[in-house]
Amino acid sequence: MIIVTGGAGFIGSNIVKALNNIGYKDILVVDNLKDGTKFVNLVDLDIADYMDKEDFVASIVAGDDMGDIDAIFHEGACSSTTEWDGKYMMDNNYQYSKDILHFCLDRSIPFLYASSAATYGGRTDNFIEDRQYEQPLNVYGYSKFLFDQYVREILPQADSQICGFRYFNVYGPREGHKGSMASVAFHLNNQINAGERPKLFAGSENFKRDFIYVGDVADVNLWFWQNGVSGIFNCGTGRAESFQAVADAVVDYHQSGPVEYIEFPEKLKGRYQAYTQADLTKLRAAGYGKPFKTVAEGVKEYLAWLNRSV
């Protein structure tokens, strides 16, 4: 069996889909379906069982026998960069991750988990997996950073796989439940389908991010699991592309336009990553050689999926 925490969420459900694609269906999804809309991410997937997050935490802390487990993909977390409840964030992202990590270490179960590019904070260069380059801007980034630090202390002594991925700007199918935290491509598509002009912040040609298609993220996870590689790795494309490029791809797909530019919100100033670009040196050195989709390629594939039944 494989366990995917956050399996009804965005990246988790795409990992479940990727596992299904290689014939793997003995999957336990762990999630919190308080937000009942997330169930839609699972309806076309094959899983063996579902378990509520709180029941799962109680089981692993108690050391319950959960049978033979081939791997745990730990994607479950609070991923809102605008959430400032530090206790909630640390319980959800830090303590929960430690509990699962030790459960895996005690049983030699491969443990692959979601870190984040938010660990790098507001820097504009050297997005390198090293302590000197890490300075998170918000409590979400700090919770991810602190767990990475915890993992770094344990890695040299670990007898089983521990692998963390610093996800950059992930977009693609199954993110609709994220609301305001969903990708720009998702929101622009909705605006156009509602008969509105697509809206971007003024200066969006200058805001550049490393946008990575979620299918590529799932591929990275499966490759590292199948190859047993440990460490903390950036998971981006190695290319910074502008929000304008995302809008251009959406407008091109819909043959619509023009874009309407709106003022940048005051509350985000100083807390907003203006530039991200993954350094892929470590990822490539580990042996991962697949190419990553460009924004133009990924957005086109994503919009075809989003509009498949419109």
UniProtKB/Swiss-Prot annotation:
The residues annotated as the active site are Y140, K178
Which residues make up the binding site for NADP(+)?
A: 10-11, 31-32, 38, 53, 75-79, 92, 144, 170, 178
Q: How is the cofactor bound?
A: Binds 1 NADP(+) per subunit.
Q: Record's Pfam families? A: Epimerase
Catalytic reaction list: ADP-D-glycero-beta-D-manno-heptose = ADP-L-glycero-beta-D-manno-heptose
Q: Which cofactor does it need?
A: NADP(+)
Q: Show the GO MF annotations.
A: ADP-glyceromanno-heptose 6-epimerase activity; NADP binding
| Swiss-Prot/TrEMBL GO biological process terms | ADP-L-glycero-beta-D-manno-heptose biosynthetic process; lipopolysaccharide core region biosynthetic process
Top-level class of the enzyme under EC nomenclature: isomerase
Under Enzyme Commission nomenclature, its number is 5.1.3.20
- The entry marks the following residues as binding substrate, namely N169, S180, H187, F201, A202, G203, S204, R209, Y272
Supply the alphabetized keyword list.
Carbohydrate metabolism, Isomerase, NADP
Pathway it belongs to? Nucleotide-sugar biosynthesis; ADP-L-glycero-beta-D-manno-heptose biosynthesis; ADP-L-glycero-beta-D-manno-heptose from D-glycero-beta-D-manno-heptose 7-phosphate: step 4/4; Bacterial outer membrane biogenesis; LPS core biosynthesis
PANTHER family in the cross-refs: ADP-L-GLYCERO-D-MANNO-HEPTOSE-6-EPIMERASE (PTHR43103:SF3), NUCLEOSIDE-DIPHOSPHATE-SUGAR EPIMERASE (PTHR43103)
Main function? Catalyzes the interconversion between ADP-D-glycero-beta-D-manno-heptose and ADP-L-glycero-beta-D-manno-heptose via an epimerization at carbon 6 of the heptose.
The text of the family note is:
Belongs to the NAD(P)-dependent epimerase/dehydratase family. HldD subfamily.
The text the record gives for the protein's domains is: Contains a large N-terminal NADP-binding domain, and a smaller C-terminal substrate-binding domain.
Q: Relate the assembly described in the record.
A: Homopentamer.
Name of the molecule in the record: ADP-L-glycero-D-manno-heptose-6-epimerase
Query: Which source organism?
Result: Yersinia pestis
Gene giving rise to this polypeptide: hldD
